[in-house]
Design a protein with these regions (language model features):
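His/Met- and acidic-residue-enriched segments that coordinate or traffic transition-metal cofactors
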Residues: 3-9, 16-208
């Protein structure tokens, strides 16, 4: 009888130890869907950016595309590590929608390419910011929530820059006084704030 009691105690202890570990590696459906969408978005920005570095006419469009390849590549590496820790294998290939966009862009060049690519970048990043804002507020998993919050400043910077370059390719460059140049280059720094030199998107400091 005593032996059975000891065995039962050990079994209960093992269950108590293993259940939390398993739970830590699981995501609810909403968080899992977010991780998958974020991965698809990263792959799309990387692949479309690579096309743009080869086919864009304006230097500003090529520069934007290079930034997308770099930033989304770094973000996707972080996301892939997070996903694996949660038992998820994220996609590393384009989804049907973005594959069709890639095929379309590959058939364009010059000003036509610039307009089509930048229009897509504004649309994609508008959706990305909304998606990440929701997850940063409502994610159930703490790690996923933190990842979404960390990514937001860069995504907001991408959206602001995409809008700026898109305006340039559709309407032409805007000429402004030199004193306003910083605000145009980094329009997401608002009010009494100015861009911090040598920092990534989304970093602002009080203006001196």
């Amino acid at each position: 009888m005593k032996a059975l009691t000891v065995i039962s105690f050990v079994a209960v202890a093992l269950i108590a130890l293993t259940v939390p570990v398993a739970a830590q590696g699981q995501l609810n459906d909403a968080d899992r869907e977010f991780v998958n969408k974020a991965a698809i978005g990263n792959v799309a920005e990387i692949e479309l950016g690579r096309v743009a570095t080869q086919r864009a006419a304006r230097p500003s469009v090529r520069s934007f595309a290079e930034r997308m390849v770099t930033d989304h590549g770094e973000n996707n590496a972080e996301l892939t590590t997070l996903a694996r820790s949660k038992g998820i294998d994220v996609s590393s290939t384009l989804d049907t929608t973005h594959q069709a966009m890639r095929d379309r862009l590959s058939g364009l060049s010059g000003a036509d390419f610039d307009r089509a690519y930048m229009s897509e970048m504004v649309r994609d990043h508008t959706e990305d910011v909304a998606l990440f804002e929701r997850e940063a507020q409502s994610a159930s998993d703490a790690d996923v929530k933190a990842y979404a919050a960390r990514s937001l400043p860069t995504l907001r910077g991408h959206l602001a820059l995409a809008r700026q370059v898109n305006s340039e390719v559709t309407l032409g460059p805007t000429v402004v006084p030199s004193a306003m140049a910083a605000a145009v280059i980094v329009p997401w720094c608002q009010g009494a704030y100015a861009p911090t030199a040598g920092t990534n998107f989304g970093n602002c400091a009080p203006a001196k």
